[in-house]
Amino acid sequence: TCGYCKWEYFTEVLEYVDLVLYDLKHLDSAEHKRLTGVDNQLILENAAKVVKKVKEMIIRVPLIPSLNDSKDNIMMLVDFVSTLEKVKEIDLLPYHQLGVSKYNQIGQTYKLNEINPPSKEKINDIKRYIENRGFLVKVGG
């Protein structure tokens, strides 16, 4: 989940799940709003509530070069996740261009044509930083 919903919706399903995969895209609220159309306040509030109700929560981070892979964002993200006691794992989901042809097939414009996937070096740098902060890190979905 991206976590952007009323808390009541979470409470309806959390009693049935042990594991939640929770996406965090950007920790700066204004930048999150620019990228997604909504700020991240509700998302962060829900993350803090969800983690108290489940056995395990894994944070998933789509890594999109020049949009959310900055050192500042990664540092803020790890600082926030460090407050979520049950989170031990962060999954990095590097941007790829595998869906470009699908956009063409349905007559839609692909808006990220100018963005290339992150380099292995960049991914490994981010992975090492997060591991050094005490988290298990997996790359890919």
Residue ranges and their predicted role:
Residues 1-98, 104:
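Conserved AdoMet/S-adenosylmethionine-binding subsite of the radical SAM
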Residues 121-141:
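A cross-taxonomic marker for long C-terminal extensions/tails that follow the last structured domain
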Residues 104-113:
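Short glycine/proline- and charge-enriched loop/turn segments
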Residues 112-122:
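Short, flexible active-site recognition loops that position polar ligands and cofactors
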